[in-house]
């Protein structure tokens, strides 16, 4: 499946000067919501991702996503895997498990995002679940921005990667774009970074 083409066809691969939720600036932005607004395409992407996870023979009892960006991807992946789905959300800037969601002791949970950049949000989600007694077995995303090490990819983890190296990250594609710390961003000399979504927008 050509994931890049899916993003391009959905006009979800944006070019400009963007502030990512990770804090980095980039000349490209992946707007997964535009891809996932098509239920059939969302289902197909999730089924492809589920195949990787099933081939790894992991025992997964639940999928959890950090709101808001990961919810659609996580729900579709849970459906493809035949397991339940829950999500965490920020309350006054702190990730929390709410809405009556519960975690069983040692419940095997996969954390799913739409896009993984550094993995910071995914780790915040995982920490909340672990504090409730869950056992995190893997991470997943539709696309990986190349900072974290993806299963079946030749790319190595970068210094800013937050995901633990001992757990697998499943994703359909690596999207490797230039990313800059704000104080060293060459794009800032000619324009101001915009934030098209996720946190706080």
From Swiss-Prot:
Keywords: Glycosyltransferase, Magnesium, Pyrimidine biosynthesis, Transferase. Signal peptide: none annotated. It is an enzyme of class 2 (transferase). Orotate binds at residues 117, 145. Pathway: Pyrimidine metabolism; UMP biosynthesis via de novo pathway; UMP from orotate: step 1/2. Its EC number is 2.4.2.10. The keyword rRNA processing does not apply. Homodimer. This is Orotate phosphoribosyltransferase. It comes from Helicobacter acinonychis (strain Sheeba).
């Amino acid at each position: 499946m050509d994931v890049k083409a899916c993003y391009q066809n959905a006009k979800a691969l944006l070019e400009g000067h963007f502030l990512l939720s990770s804090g980095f600036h980039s000349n490209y932005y992946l707007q997964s919501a535009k891809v996932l607004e098509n239920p059939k395409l969302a289902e197909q992407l999730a089924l492809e991702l589920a195949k990787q996870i099933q081939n790894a023979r992991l025992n997964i009892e639940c999928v959890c996503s950090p709101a808001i960006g990961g919810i659609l991807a996580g729900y579709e992946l849970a459906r493809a895997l035949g397991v339940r789905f829950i999500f965490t959300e920020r309350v006054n800037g702190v990730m929390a498990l709410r809405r009556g969601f519960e975690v069983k002791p040692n419940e095997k949970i996969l954390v799913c995002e739409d896009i993984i950049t550094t993995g910071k949000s995914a780790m915040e989600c995982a920490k909340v679940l672990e504090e409730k007694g869950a056992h995190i077995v893997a991470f997943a995303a539709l696309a990986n921005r190349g900072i974290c090490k993806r299963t079946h990819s030749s790319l190595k983890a970068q210094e800013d990667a937050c995901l633990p190296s001992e757990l697998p990250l499943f994703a359909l594609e690596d999207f490797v774009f230039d990313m800059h710390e704000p104080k060293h961003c060459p794009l800032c000399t000619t324009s101001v970074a915009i934030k098209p979504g996720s946190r706080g927008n």
